[in-house]
């Protein structure tokens, strides 16, 4: 849904790296090299970014009206 701010395993800050990561990967760059450039070294943090599925636009249709 929404990218977590911190890694679930080690607590490292990863939320600020999502936008540059997804932008560069969608432009055709290798995800591994992008993560290296962003300074994401731990495999637990890399997993958080690589395996995230952004489904917030699909879920928002099911919210209750206020």
From Swiss-Prot:
Keywords from the UniProt entry: Cytoplasm, DNA-directed RNA polymerase, Metal-binding, Nucleotidyltransferase, Transcription, Transferase, Zinc
Q: Which GO terms describe its biological process?
A: DNA-templated transcription
Q: Which residues bind Zn(2+)?
A: 7, 10, 44-45
Q: Name one GO molecular function term.
A: DNA binding
Q: Which reaction does it catalyse?
A: RNA(n) + a ribonucleoside 5'-triphosphate = RNA(n+1) + diphosphate
Compartments, record wording = Cytoplasm
Claim: Membrane is one of the keywords in the record? no
What domain of life does the native source organism fall in? Archaea
Q: Which cofactor does it need?
A: Zn(2+)
Q: Which GO terms describe its cellular component?
A: cytoplasm; DNA-directed RNA polymerase complex
Keyword check for DNA damage, yes or no: no
Which free-text remark accompanies the cofactor? Binds 1 zinc ion.
What EC designation does it have?
2.7.7.6
Q: Which PROSITE patterns match?
A: RNA_POL_N_8KD
Instruction: Name the PANTHER family on file.
Output: DNA-DIRECTED RNA POLYMERASES I, II, AND III SUBUNIT RPABC5, DNA-DIRECTED RNA POLYMERASES I, II, AND III SUBUNIT RPABC5 FAMILY MEMBER
What the record says about family reads: Belongs to the archaeal Rpo10/eukaryotic RPB10 RNA polymerase subunit family.
- What do we know about how this protein assembles, alone or with others? Part of the RNA polymerase complex.
Report the NCBIfam families cross-referenced here: PRK04016.1
Q: Which HAMAP family does the record cross-reference, listed alphabetically? A: RNApol_arch_Rpo10 (MF_00250)
Q: What does this protein do?
A: DNA-dependent RNA polymerase (RNAP) catalyzes the transcription of DNA into RNA using the four ribonucleoside triphosphates as substrates.
Under what name is this protein listed? DNA-directed RNA polymerase subunit Rpo10
Q: Which gene encodes it?
A: rpo10
């Amino acid at each position: 849904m929404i990218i977590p701010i911190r890694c679930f395993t080690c607590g490292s800050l990863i939320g600020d790296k999502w936008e540059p990561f997804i932008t560069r990967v969608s432009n055709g760059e290798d995800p591994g090299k992008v993560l290296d450039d962003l300074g994401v070294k731990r495999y637990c943090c890399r997993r958080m970014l690589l395996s995230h599925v952004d489904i917030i636009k699909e879920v928002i249709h099911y919210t209750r009206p206020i």
